[in-house]
Amino acid sequence: MTVLNRLHVCSLLAVSSLGMLPVGVFAAEAAMPGVDHSQMQGMDHSKMQGMDHSQMQGMDHSKMQGMDHSQMQGMDSDMTTMAPSKPAAPTQSRTPIAPVTDANRAAVYRSAKGHTVHDEAANYFLLFDQLEWQDADNGSVLNWDVNGWVGGDIDRLWIRSEGERTNGKTESAELQALWGHAISPWWDLVGGVRQDFKPGSPQTWAAFGLQGLALYNFEAEATAFLGEGGQTGLRLEGDYDILLTNRLILQPTAEVNFYGQSDPQRGIGSGLSETEVGVRLRYEIRREFAPYIGVTWNRSYGNTADFAREEGEDRSEARLVLGVRMWF
């Protein structure tokens, strides 16, 4: 019996000891011609030395004698004992899928113009930012500062009005009508007309400027004016809301006026004409209605101060103010 045959039988015995082969396999091995099991000597595994695989030569199966695999019993090539394989997944849906139509494509790929929103809806807003009584040196003063708009998110018609009445007499009054166009979410370009009713005779100005929110929600306005006779002017305004609580708000304000030339009839001097700073503390009973108390400080400069002294007025004055702020 060749060494290869002996190795084959030993492997079968080892597998049998693990219960991995049926008895029929060994019956087939016993019936295999050319293999004399009686000649096989007991294998002393203690004599087996480490196998040097590097010395193993290629096996020539053509030299193997006496092994007739056709005589092996118990091995059925059909392998009926194996579990049947799972059926292949269907390649088509039970419910046929309808072909894509133009209507389907239109529903998915909409126009790039964006969703329809209320961009062009007309709205309005009216704010009485200052409607107050002032304790002035010359008596009681009624002061107002009103602005509002009507239009959409991009284009609006702005209305501004401010003035004061002292002891029932109108000292100053003006009205502005401006068309505003949004150039960013926070800033508008404005242009239009300004009409002065007092002081002096009425005067009409062309107006254009910029308004919006600066850093930290600081509201700012810069408006330039071109009046009759070549008169020019520039007004800078700003205010800021400081929330002490959700309803108690402190509001500092500032206004500066410049003019290109003197106008004695209206008490206006060239250059820096006048400034006004103030602070108002309001309590919002409702968001739309808030009474307030505050103080303002006015000062005239240059020729404007000289014209004020000629009228018997001081160049600077502090006033206590009481008023309400409301909007619609």
From Swiss-Prot:
Region called Disordered, residue ranges: 44-71
Q: Does the keyword Repeat apply?
A: yes
User: InterPro entries this protein is in?
Assistant: Cu-R_B_prcur
- What residue stretch is flagged as signal peptide? 1-27
Described by its record, this protein's role is as follows: Exact function not known. Possibly mediates copper resistance by its sequestration in the outer membrane.
Gene Ontology MF terms in the entry: copper ion binding
What processes does the entry annotate via GO biological process terms?
intracellular copper ion homeostasis
Q: Please verify whether the record's keywords include Zinc.
A: no
Please state where this protein is localized: Cell outer membrane
Query: Where does the record place its sequence repeats?
Result: 36-43, 44-51, 52-59, 60-67, 68-75
Q: Which domain of life is it from?
A: Bacteria
Where is it mostly found? Answer: membrane
Instruction: Describe what upregulates or represses it.
Output: By copper.
User: Keywords, A to Z?
Assistant: Cell outer membrane, Copper, Membrane, Plasmid, Repeat, Signal
Naturally occurring in which organism (per UniProt): Pseudomonas syringae pv. tomato
| Protein name, per record | Copper resistance protein B
Cellular component GO terms, alphabetical: cell outer membrane
Outline the segment boundaries, as ranges, of region: 5 X 8 AA tandem repeats of D-H-S-[QK]-M-Q-G-M: 36-75
